[in-house]
Amino acid sequence: MSTETDEILERLKKITLLEAYELVKQIENTFGVDATIALSASNTNPSILPSKADETVVEEKTEFDVIIQEVPSAKRINVIKTVRSLTTLGLKEAKDLIESVPKVVCEAVSKEVAEETKKLLEEAGASIIIK
């Protein structure tokens, strides 16, 4: 192998699983290939591989809403503090938000942001759903 491919291989060894997943998705989009077919093709008779006409397109959701479902009264102060740290809301607005649940806290955010927001709010004591 050339030194350039050796360097690429060494860099690939150091990336996380999430980064590897994102890299595969970018390669698929850039070159118009499907890694799942390439992986299964090595162990399969090519005549039985699905054609493009047989595939159904399933779009992966990219934007999510984080919704506070319920806040126990004993946890209200912690949830208000967390809402304020996650948003630009003031004290009164954050208090009003948690008193009128279910309410959207974060709208049209990435899956990673939605999961992190959910984790923080659940740690504060709120019941959360992601849609």
From Swiss-Prot:
Corresponding gene?
rpl12
> Pfam families from the xrefs?
Ribosomal_L12, Ribosomal_L12_N
Offer an example of a GO molecular function term for this protein.
mRNA binding
Q: Name one GO cellular component term.
A: chloroplast
Q: Which domain of life is it from?
A: Eukaryota
- CDD domains found in the cross-reference section: Ribosomal_L7_L12
Q: Which UniProt keywords apply?
A: Chloroplast, Plastid, Ribonucleoprotein, Ribosomal protein
Annotated family = Belongs to the bacterial ribosomal protein bL12 family.
Can you say what this protein is called?
Large ribosomal subunit protein bL12c
Supply the Gene3D superfamilies for this chain.
Answer: 3.30.1390.10, Single helix bin
State any GO BP term from the record: translation
Write down the species. Answer: Euglena gracilis
Task: Report quaternary structure and partners.
Answer: Homodimer. Part of the ribosomal stalk of the 50S ribosomal subunit. Forms a multimeric L10(L12)X complex, where L10 forms an elongated spine to which 2 to 4 L12 dimers bind in a sequential fashion. Binds GTP-bound translation factors.
InterPro entries annotated for this entry?
A: Ribosomal_bL12, Ribosomal_bL12_C, Ribosomal_bL12_C/ClpS-like, Ribosomal_bL12_oligo, Ribosomal_bL12_oligo_N_sf
Where found, per UniProt?
A: Plastid, Chloroplast
Report the SS bond pairs.
none
Q: What is the lineage of its organism?
A: Eukaryota, Discoba, Euglenozoa, Euglenida, Spirocuta
Q: What does this protein do?
A: Forms part of the ribosomal stalk which helps the ribosome interact with GTP-bound translation factors. Is thus essential for accurate translation.
Give the coiled coil ranges: none
